[in-house]
Amino acid sequence: MTQQKMDIKNVVLAYSGGLDTSIILKWLKNEYGCRVVAFSADLGQGEELDPVREKALATGADVVYIDDLREEFVRDFVFPMFRANAIYEGHYLLGTSIARPLIAKRQMEIAAKEGCDAVSHGSTGKGNDQVRFELGYYHFNPNIKIVAPWRTWDLNSRQALIDYAKKNGIPVPVTKKRPWSSDRNLLHISFEGGILEDTWAEAPEEMYVLTTAPEKAPNKPQYVEIEFKNGNAVAVDGEKMTPAQLLAHLNYLGGQHGIGRVDLLENRSVGMKSRGVYETPGGTILREAHMAVEQITMDREVMRIRDGLIPEYARLVYAGYWFSPEREMLQALIDDSQKCVNGVARLKLYKGYCRTVGRKSDTDSLFNQDFATFEKDQVYNQADAEGFIRINSLRLRIRSMMQAAKKK
């Protein structure tokens, strides 16, 4: 055993209960001879968490934590991100990306509580999650030791993993494994790998979990009203809900109508392209509703500046920089812009589409029908438009004159 391994006595493992992290748990015990604390975060995975405690203990965990973080997840991570209207490469609502900082945060809290000198995760050396987890770890403890088995061990094939599991008494699922991997929380479920690596092949219908096929969704549209306060959704159809309850409810409504499916070939942080298929029914509805209320309450120039920051904000979340000073700076600016975002959006849900059909704000509306009408009013003199246009066209007219002069 190397000195580095001898220095590690207590490890907190981010444990999902799946075959890979079960093998990692046993591998940590075998290779390091250390105490292993297994930690699973309940972010809304549902039934996936039911067997986790028993499986972790059976595999050799000394202590098991299963923490319900659903409200914190939506309130402190999803909602701030949605106040920014963050979207990565025009399609991805960052459901996996935004979950990792919270898992890392709680994992480090457990490490401090349990006196652990190292943390471990099951992310591969080719993916984004290794970066997201470890940037979070170092934020909370710059000196923490990190064990990332996928970057060091020799179990480099699925068969090698299965052989190791059988050798160490870890149950291997006897049912045929679905030919893709998935990750689920309250915001979304993602699918990647396996048959999805053929970028031309359509994702099979049996893959989808949260959403009805749009063509099989109800033939009658459903209308939903979502109320916002300071940029955060607080009620659906007049019923107040907690953040987690609200997102779960929108997931149910959106799922019924086939809303929120995305098939994307995205650029990973490490440089390669990767295909991901996502279901984000509630998040898709929430973002559309939020933008609708912004349309009636937010100043044009404030919106223009904020919109210019969305790609950078989304990149920071995607790349794992949630705890960075630059993300916090952007968040402060964005949150200041949300003080006026108070109102209600009315949306129409129908066969995969989510469309705004109305918006209102009793306290912060900047829309005045008297000003917007084509009828005469006391505020706007239409003749003033001529001077406005001539001033704004000055640079264009000068450019045209200069180009004409060059041709002479």
UniProtKB/Swiss-Prot annotation:
It comes from the Bacteria. L-aspartate binds at T124, N128, D129. Its main location: cytoplasm. InterPro entries: Arginosuc_syn_C, Arginosuc_syn_N, Arginosuc_synth, Arginosuc_synth_CS, Arginosuc_synth_type_1_subfam, AS_cat/multimer_dom_body, Rossmann-like_a/b/a_fold. It is found in: Cytoplasm. L-citrulline binds at Y92, S97, N128, R132, S181, S190, E266, Y278. Pathway: Amino-acid biosynthesis; L-arginine biosynthesis; L-arginine from L-ornithine and carbamoyl phosphate: step 2/3. GO terms for molecular function: argininosuccinate synthase activity; ATP binding. GO terms for cellular component: cytoplasm. It comes from Pelobacter propionicus (strain DSM 2379 / NBRC 103807 / OttBd1). PANTHER family: ARGININOSUCCINATE SYNTHASE. Its EC number is 6.3.4.5. ATP binds at A14, Y15, S16, G17, G18, L19, D20, T21, S22, A41, G122. It catalyses: L-citrulline + L-aspartate + ATP = 2-(N(omega)-L-arginino)succinate + AMP + diphosphate + H(+). One of its GO terms (biological process) is L-arginine biosynthetic process. This is Argininosuccinate synthase. Keywords: Amino-acid biosynthesis, Arginine biosynthesis, ATP-binding, Cytoplasm, Ligase, Nucleotide-binding. It is an enzyme of class 6 (ligase). Homotetramer. Belongs to the argininosuccinate synthase family. Type 1 subfamily.
